[in-house]
Design a protein with these regions (language model features):
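Predominantly the C-terminal beta-signal and adjacent terminal strand-loop region
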Residues: 81, 85, 160-208
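Residues that define the transmembrane beta-barrel architecture of outer-membrane proteins
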Residues: 30-34, 51-57, 98-104, 117, ...
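Extracellular loop and loop/strand-boundary signature of outer-membrane beta-barrel proteins
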Residues: 44-48, 89-96, 145-152, 185-189
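Short glycine/proline- and aromatic-enriched beta-strand/turn motifs that initiate or cap beta-hairpins
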Residues: 19-71, 196-198, 202-208
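Positively charged n-region of N-terminal signal peptides that target proteins for export
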Residues: 1-4, 20
Length: 208
C-alpha cells in the first residue's frame, strides 16, 4: 500500500511541475484543477446488508484541456461506512464494525461547455482498499451474529464510478460545484460487491 501511495505522489508532483508551461506542444491551453471533495452516500444492494451510509473526503488533481474540453486526473481519499445494527427480542442492540476504505481513482471527465459554468459527465476507473465486517450478509450469519465478535475481510478491489457534475468558476482561481456518482466495486475472493449512490461538494483551486 505504501508503494501505491508513493507512486501516486510522484505522478501528482510531475503533473504540478508540467503545469507551469500552460500549453501542450500543439499549442492547446490547459488548466490544472486541485480539488477537495467531501461527500456522502447511501449504501445499496448487498452493501446495505452490513452498512447504511458512507461518508468521506477526497483530494483530486485534474489536467483539463480547454479546447478539447476533456479532463484527466487522479483522485484518492478516505471513506467511512456507517455500520448496520441488529436487534433481537430480549437482547441488546448490537452494531456491526464500521468499514474503512481508501480509494485510488483515475478520472476522465468531459465538459459540455467550458465557460464559467461547466457541466460535465465522467467515468472513474481504479482500485479501492477496504476493511469490512460481513456479519449480516446472510440469514445464517445473522442468526449467529450474537455468538461472534467480528467477521471481517480486507483487501483490494477493482471499481468503476460513472458520474455527472457541475463546476462554477467564481473567478480565475476558485470554483465550487456538485458531483453525483454511482461507484461500483466488483467482488473479489471473499470481498463482496459494493455499490452506492453518492453526492459530493467540490472546492476547486485553478492553476491556469
Amino acid at each position: 500500500m505504501k508503494k501505491h501511495i508513493l507512486i501516486l505522489a510522484l505522478i501528482l508532483t510531475s503533473l504540478c511541475a508540467f503545469s507551469q508551461r500552460h500549453r501542450l506542444p500543439n499549442g492547446e491551453p490547459y488548466d490544472i484543477f486541485m480539488q477537495i471533495k467531501p461527500m456522502g452516500g447511501i449504501a445499496l444492494g448487498d452493501f446495505a446488508k452490513n452498512n447504511t451510509y458512507i461518508y468521506g473526503s477526497h483530494f483530486a488533481l485534474e489536467f483539463q484541456l480547454q479546447e478539447t474540453k476533456l479532463g484527466i486526473g487522479l483522485e484518492f481519499g478516505y471513506n467511512y461506512c456507517v455500520p448496520m445494527a441488529i436487534k433481537r427480542p430480549f437482547l441488546q442492540t448490537k452494531n456491526n464494525w464500521a468499514s474503512h476504505q481508501i480509494p485510488m481513482i483515475l478520472n476522465f471527465n468531459y465538459y459540455i461547455f467550458n465557460e464559467r459554468i461547466k457541466p460535465y459527465v465522467g467515468l472513474g476507473i481504479g482500485t479501492i482498499w477496504g476493511r469490512y465486517d460481513y456479519s449480516l450478509s446472510t440469514e445464517e450469519s445473522t442468526e449467529e451474529y450474537y455468538l461472534r465478535d467480528f467477521e471481517g475481510q480486507s483487501g483490494w478491489r477493482f471499481g468503476l464510478t460513472p458520474k455527472v457534475g457541475l463546476m462554477i468558476s467564481m473567478d480565475h482561481r476558485h470554483g465550487f460545484g456538485l458531483e453525483f456518482s454511482l461507484p461500483y466495486q466488483f467482488g473479489f475472493n471473499r470481498l463482496e460487491t459494493q455499490y452506492s449512490i453518492n453526492l459530493g461538494l467540490n472546492y476547486t483551486y485553478i492553476i491556469d
